[in-house]
Amino acid sequence: MLENIRLSLQGILSHKVRSILTMLGIIIGIAAIIAIVSTIKGTNEQIKNNLIGSGNNNVNVQLYQGESPYDFSYQAAPDGVQVVSAEVRDQITSLKNVESASFYRTRSYCDNVYYQNTQFSGSMYGIDAAYFDTAGYEVQQGRGFLSKEYTNNAKAVILDSTAVKSLYSSESPIGSVIDINGEPFTVVGVVTEVSSFEPVINSEEDYWTYMGTSGGKMFIPGQSWPIAYRYDEPENCLAKAVDTDSMPAVGKKVAELMNATIRTNSVGKEGDSNQIKYDSQDLLKQA
């Protein structure tokens, strides 16, 4: 009788131990899955922030030829693409989830821009009055463009802090003259990005992915662009979304509105390898 009771208690105890071990294994397994998922989500968020930047939410819609941005340095403006009209501008700024929008022209590399004997190797932008607020810049030295300078073909230029470091030693850039394609432009201000976000760099590959190379940026009023470059060049659009997750939809809609103004018979059909069209730089998809 006692032996039966003892065996019964041993059986119950062994089952309980197995149950406890089973439960412990399940708990450990679930915890491991949660940890892995959390790590992956954290890594994805870090990559997203590295590519997009913290609190920026800007979508860049540019004119493309095939898979590459259209290069105005070596090509004339395509016949079927016109300057963005006031009506299209209003439609874009009124889009859902668009906080602000700016329209600009650019040269990604300048081969005939000098301060004294020093050549500038950065980018040139012809901007409107909304650009600095949309892109997240603030005046660090001097001043921004006056309202009249956006409309009266003023030969004024603003540098970013990187351009200042590349061109000047210790002297102030304010009041100095920059030669842009043979035309003298006076420096009226220096701007810097408001956001202090810095990407997390863990390797050399990360550095080139997130930072790249830059000789800085120069900005001139959009109306002054033809003084140094060409008349009636098509513009790009920089649209600021209300949040990061809205960026893909904003980029797609802005590109659709701008593409609707292109004469398709002049720039190729959909699917052509050299088709010219506006497209958004989808950093969120890349992330």
What are these regions (language model features)?
Residues M1-I30:
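N-terminal Sec/SRP start-transfer signal
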Residues I47, L238, G251, T264-A287:
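Peri-transmembrane interface segments
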Residues A130-G144, K155-V267:
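Mid-to-C-terminal secondary-structure elements
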Residues A76-P78, Q82-Q91, F103-R107, Q116-Q119, ...:
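Subset-of-secretome marker
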Residues L9-L13, K41-N44, K48, L284-A287:
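Alpha-helical membrane-interface segments at transmembrane helix boundaries
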Residues K41-S123, A130-D133, K148, P226-I227, ...:
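Hydrophobic, regular-secondary-structure patches
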Residues I26, I36-T39, I47:
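Juxtamembrane alpha-helical signal-transduction segment immediately C-terminal to a transmembrane helix
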